[in-house]
């Protein structure tokens, strides 16, 4: 189903969307704890603590956003998927960059940022009617 603003609403169930958002939130807390405790010395030694923390921040913020979208009926799947893919690429590339210090990974990060921005823009431009 597509609304007047072109926002896709497909068969993604609210339950599936909640599980995905919950998994992303779980991962954010897990990575935050790993960075603060288990990886602390490694990240400090390599000077990549801030990079790791940025990945955790965007991971957690967008997990909450996806959790909110999971309550919409129907779930706006295009926006949901763009934000999800974006945060996986954005935060994932930052986690890998912080661990490996492989600098070309920094060039991948903006692709994830564009995915997240695109998802938010789809929401802003959609003409979803309040029910």
Which residues does each PLM region occupy?
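Polytopic transmembrane helical bundles with strong interfacial aromatic enrichment
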Residues: 8-131
């Amino acid at each position: 189903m597509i609304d007047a603003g072109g926002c896709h609403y497909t068969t993604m169930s609210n339950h599936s969307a909640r599980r995905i958002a919950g998994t992303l939130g779980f991962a954010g807390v897990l990575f935050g704890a790993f960075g603060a405790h288990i990886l602390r010395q490694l990240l400090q030694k390599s000077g990549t603590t801030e990079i790791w923390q940025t990945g955790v921040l965007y991971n957690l913020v967008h997990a909450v956003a996806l959790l909110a979208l999971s309550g919409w009926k129907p779930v706006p799947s295009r926006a949901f998927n763009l934000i999800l893919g974006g945060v996986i690429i954005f935060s994932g590339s930052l986690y890998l960059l912080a661990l490996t210090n492989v600098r070309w990974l920094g060039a991948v990060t903006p692709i994830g940022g564009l995915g997240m921005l695109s998802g938010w823009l789809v929401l802003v431009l959609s003409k979803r009617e309040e029910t």
